[in-house]
Amino acid sequence: MEPAREPPSRARPPPPLAARPAPAPAAPRPRSPAEAEARGPEGLLRRSGSGYEGSTSWKAALEDTTTRLLLGAIAVLLFAILVVMSILASKGCIKCEAPCPEDWLLYGRKCYFFSEEPRDWNTGRQYCHTHEAVLAVIQSQKELEFMFKFTRREPWIGLRRVGDEFHWVNGDPFDPDTFTIAGPGECVFVEPTRLVSTECLMTRPWVCSKMAYT
């Protein structure tokens, strides 16, 4: 007979280890001033985009908008001033570059206009008046010679009889030693070498004169 076998032995569990003590909590790390500020109430407001920082941003945006509007208004005002100055300057330049209006001739310090169509003396005077001028006032023989370089049609001038005397339309006195006047009429026109008076209703061309621009 075979000898009886012993039952296999079971492994014994290891003896229980001694209970390990729980680790002590680590001491809190001191915070830097920046971390403390970020974790404080103002830091939370900054991170949330409202409150203190939001109010500051809104004020900055408002100030920026106001500044832009002010600068825009200043720019518009400066532009308007430049436009006005350019207009005034252009008018001044016209006077400086052209001492007489278009279709007028310069002689000495006067501008002269020689009409082409015949009219009576009063119509010629009115035309000159509307152009800020008068029927020509002649002060010398040279001025008379200049006029006849541009007209041969014996035009009206600004001389008229008032009572027994002749007077220039601008108020200057007439000097009989400078010119002689022929004819019994009231209004005066010019011939190449003398002045002639005739009826004012007769039609003739006329000559206007005025001071040149300075």
From Swiss-Prot:
Q: Where is this protein primarily located?
A: membrane
Q: Which UniProt keywords apply?
A: Disulfide bond, Lectin, Membrane, Phosphoprotein, Transmembrane, Transmembrane helix
What membrane topology does this protein have? Answer: Single-pass membrane protein
Q: Name one GO cellular component term.
A: membrane
Membrane-traversing stretches:
69-89
| Disulfide bond residue pairs | 128-208, 187-200
Segments for region (Disordered):
1-56
Write out the GO MF terms. carbohydrate binding
The record's section on CDD domains has: CLECT_NK_receptors_like
Task: Please indicate which superkingdom the organism of origin belongs to.
Answer: Eukaryota
This protein's record includes keyword Phosphoprotein: yes
Q: Where in the cell is it found?
A: Membrane
**Keyword Disulfide bond found:** yes
Q: Where in this chain does the record put each C-type lectin domain?
A: 107-209
Phosphoserine: modified positions: 32
Q: Which PROSITE patterns does the protein's record reference?
A: C_TYPE_LECTIN_1, C_TYPE_LECTIN_2
The name this protein carries in UniProt is C-type lectin domain family 2 member L
Pfam families, per the entry: Lectin_C
Which Gene3D superfamilies does this entry report, sorted A to Z?
Mannose-Binding Protein A, subunit A (3.10.100.10)
